[in-house]
Regions:
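Glycine-rich phosphate/pyrophosphate-binding beta-alpha loops
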Residues: 116, 328-341
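FAD-binding beta-loop-beta segment adjacent to the flavin cofactor pocket
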Residues: 303-334
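Ferredoxin-type iron-sulfur electron-transfer modules and their immediate structural context
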Residues: 78-84, 89-93, 377-427
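N-terminal FAD cofactor-binding segment of flavoenzymes
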Residues: 39, 47-96
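Conserved Rossmann-like nucleotide-cofactor binding loop
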Residues: 21, 50, 191
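N-terminal Rossmann-like FAD-binding beta1-loop-alpha1 element of flavoenzymes
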Residues: 13-43
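Predominantly flavin-linked oxidoreductase catalytic cores and closely associated redox partners
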Residues: 129-289, 349
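Active-site-proximal substrate-binding core of FAD-dependent oxidoreductases
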Residues: 330-336, 352-397
Length: 427
C-alpha cells in the first residue's frame, strides 16, 4: 500500500459487500449480540451508490434461509409479493420449434413455495432491517485491499477518490480510509477482488477442485399486460447454444407486468467464434419467448459472472482474521440456478461461528469452527446432493452427461456413493 496518511475507523466486524450473504451475516451477528445483551459494532461496506445498485437480477427465491433469519418477514413487508404459480421447462429446437419437458424429469426446476422477486429490492429491504439493528452501512465505498499484520487480516482499506483515468491524483483527490476490525468478512460475490486476494494469500483452495464459471446476461422488461402471466417461471435449454455447450436461459414473470430474463453460458466452451451476447439476442427471437416480449419495453440490462463449481470447488472458508461467505466462497447451487438462499445461509453460519468465539478471553483469529458448522447444516446437504451434476456433463458430454445427471437427481436424489471431480479450471 502507498504510504499515505489515512483516517482509520475501528469496528468489531467489517463486512465487504451488501448483498444477501453480507447482510445476512451482519443481521445474524447483531441478533445474537442483542439476545445475549452484548455490544458488537458492525460495518458493511458497499461499492454501489446505494444498496442494490449493482444487483440486476430477477430471482426465483427459496425463502428457507429467510424463514430462519427473519421469521416475521411477511409482517415486516419483505418485497416477496409474487409466489410461483407455474413452472415451464422447454427444450428449444430452433427459432420456431420447442417441446416441453415435464418437471417430473426436471426436478431441480420445481419452484412450488418459492417467490419471484427483484434481488436489488430485497437487498434494500434487508439493509433497512439491518440499519434498524444499528448496523452501519456505507454505500459508495470500494474495498481496495486487505490490511494484513503478522499474517492476520486486521481490516480493509477503501479506495481513493479523485483519481483520473491515468491513475493520477486530481485536485479533488481524497485518500481512502482504513476500516480496522477484529474480524473481516468477505461477501463480494463471484470473483470478488478481496476474496481472490485472501484465497491466494492463504492458499485457501489448495484442497479443493478448480472453480468453474459462467457469464450471465440479464434484462428487465415491462411486458404488454395482455401477455403477462404473473407467477410463471420459464426455463429453457437448447437452441441457439453451440453444439456441446450447455447454455441455459430463463424468463420470470414478476409483479406489475414486469419480467426478468437471462441467458447463461459456461466459460468452458472451446470455440473462439462463439458470441454469448449474440446467442442471447437470438434466444429472445425464439417463438416461445418472443411472444412475451413483443409490445414490451426493456428497462434495464447488464451482465455478471456466476460461480458454478459447486461443492467440490468450495475453498476453505476461514483464514486468520476473517471468512469467505456467499459467492466469494462459491455456495451457489447451479443445478437449481439458485444462490441467494445458499449465500444467506453461509453468512448465517459464519455469524454463528464468529459469535461462538468473539467474547472469549482469548478468541481464535482463525475461525475454523465454520467448517464443522457448515458440514452440519442443510446448506452442506443441499450442495452435496448437487455435487455430481456438472462433473457428469464435463466428463461425458452434454447429452449423456445431462442424462446421467438427471438420473442422479431424479432417481438417486444426489446420493450416489461416489463424487466426481473437476479436473481443470474452465477459464
Amino acid at each position: 500500500m502507498e504510504n499515505i496518511e489515512r483516517e482509520s475507523m475501528e469496528y468489531d466486524v467489517v463486512i465487504v459487500g451488501a448483498g444477501p450473504a453480507g447482510l445476512s451475516t451482519a443481521i445474524k451477528l447483531k441478533q445474537q449480540a442483542i439476545e445475549a445483551s452484548r455490544e458488537m459494532s458492525i460495518c458493511v461496506v458497499e461499492k454501489g451508490s446505494e444498496v442494490g445498485a449493482h444487483i440486476l437480477s430477477g430471482n426465483v427465491f427459496d425463502p428457507k434461509a429467510l424463514d430462519e433469519l427473519i421469521p416475521d418477514w411477511k409482517d415486516l413487508g419483505a418485497p416477496l409479493n409474487t409466489p410461483v404459480k407455474k413452472d415451464s421447462v422447454r427444450y428449444l429446437l430452433n427459432e420456431k420449434s420447442n417441446f416441453s419437458i415435464p418437471t417430473l424429469f426436471a426436478t431441480t426446476f420445481k419452484n412450488h413455495g418459492n417467490y419471484i422477486m427483484s434481488l436489488g429490492n430485497f437487498c434494500r429491504w434487508m439493509a433497512e432491517y439491518a440499519e434498524g439493528l444499528e448496523i452501519d452501512i456505507f454505500p459508495g465505498f470500494t474495498a481496495s485491499e486487505l490490511i494484513v499484520n503478522d499474517g492476520v487480516v486486521v481490516g480493509i482499506a477503501t479506495g481513493d477518490m479523485g483519481i483520473d483515468s491515468n491513475g493520477e491524483k486530481k485536485p479533488s483527490y481524497e485518500p481512502g480510509i482504513n476500516l480496522m476490525a477484529k474480524y473481516t468478512i468477505l461477501s463480494e460475490g463471484c470473483r470478488g477482488h478481496l476474496g481472490k486476494q485472501a484465497i491466494s494469500l492463504f492458499s485457501l483452495n489448495e484442497d479443493s477442485d478448480p472453480q468453474h464459471y459462467g457469464i450471465g446476461f440479464k434484462e428487465v422488461w415491462d411486458l404488454d399486460p395482455s401477455v403477462h402471466e404473473e407467477g410463471l417461471v420459464v426455463h429453457t435449454m437448447g437452441w441457439p447454444a453451440a453444439k456441446g455447450v450447455l447454455s441455459g436461459s430463463y424468463l420470470y414473470h414478476g409483479e406489475n407486468n414486469q419480467a426478468f430474463l437471462g441467458y447463461i453460458v459456461p466459460l468452458d466452451y472451446d470455440n473462439p467464434h462463439i458470441s454469448p451476447f449474440d446467442e442471447f439476442q437470438q434466444w429472445k427471437h425464439q417463438a416461445s419467448i418472443q411472444k412475451y416480449l413483443e409490445g414490451g419495453t426493456r428497462t434495464a440490462y447488464g451482465a455478471r459472472a456466476l460461480i458454478k463449481g459447486g461443492h467440490q470447488s468450495i475453498p476453505k472458508m476461514h483464514f486468520p482474521g476473517g471468512m469467505l461467505v456467499g459467492d466469494d466462497a462459491g455456495t451457489m447451487n447451479f443445478p437449481r440456478i439458485k444462490g441467494t438462499h445458499t449465500a444467506m445461509k453461509s453468512g448465517m453460519i459464519a455469524a454463528e461461528s464468529l459469535f461462538e468465539e468473539f467474547y472469549k478471553e482469548n478468541p481464535m483469529t482463525d475461525l475454523n469452527t465454520v467448517t464443522s458448522n457448515f458440514k452440519s447444516s442443510w446448506l452442506e446437504t443441499e450442495l452435496h446432493k448437487a455435487r455430481n451434476f456438472l462433473p457428469f456433463i464435463h466428463k461425458y458430454g452434454t447429452l449423456l452427461g445431462v442424462a446421467l445427471a438427471g438420473i442422479d437427481q431424479l432417481i438417486f436424489r444426489g446420493k450416489l456413493p461416489f463424487t466426481l471431480h473437476h479436473d481443470q479450471p474452465d477459464h
